[in-house]
């Protein structure tokens, strides 16, 4: 019944006098998205301007590179000058503005990251460790030189006259057993004034850190009555601080980390191999406080006569140990050096 009704409707529609034939007419759609559902007018140049497609709103539809490609090219060339692409072009100006905005954004990110790290460091080192836990806090600043002059605190712990005396005796012993000195200068030795033995003309000492060190600030809570051997700067009723050196010891850092998590291997390690931690002396005590391992070097001079000078160098650790002894002599207007003694030779 439904099929019969559809057939009658179709037949009556085709017999209508205004309907001559049926045909499918293709529509000519424009590339412009605003005419996606409608037919553009015959003349729309005034509305569209010179850019027919909306995807070319910032670029020209002439097959040239777009703004992103220009920005990448400008970035690779390392220049902000828009004349590299096209002088005075709008695309270059837009690309330059976007590139400048990206750089400013990167700078802001780095500034924010640096300020955040600084705030966390100060908050943890001063606010938490010093004020809350009442502990000393060390803030590293820059790497320090391994060779330096001994401080006043170091000189209080080093017996310089004893080092000078022992080194003098060791040098005289080396010279007295050397064949060249025996033949040319005689034994016992005398200086140009006939003094026996020749006296030390100059003697210097310096310190050399055993491990790499960093210079930084050590900060603690203000306590004027706290005993100390160092000179501290104060922020009254708040903090005390001073500049110091700290070694970078990987094994000690690992040991401290293990102790923090409840593990420890130092006792067993000391029993098995004590020289690895405390040196070659079995009963040597560990270094207390904020002191660290260092070598004490010395350099001295002995004047045998007006043309001969003895220079010796060595290291002090519990006992004096000579490294090298040289003889400098003026021969025919030339300065000649003779190596009289060198360690392991």
Curated annotation (Swiss-Prot):
The keyword Ribonucleoprotein does not apply. The chain crosses the membrane at residues 113-133. It is a single-pass membrane protein. Residues 76-89 have a biased composition (Low complexity). Residues 46-91 are annotated as: Disordered. Residues 64-75 have a biased composition (Polar residues). Belongs to the AIM39 family. This is Altered inheritance of mitochondria protein 39, mitochondrial. It comes from Vanderwaltozyma polyspora (strain ATCC 22028 / DSM 70294 / BCRC 21397 / CBS 2163 / NBRC 10782 / NRRL Y-8283 / UCD 57-17) (Kluyveromyces polysporus).
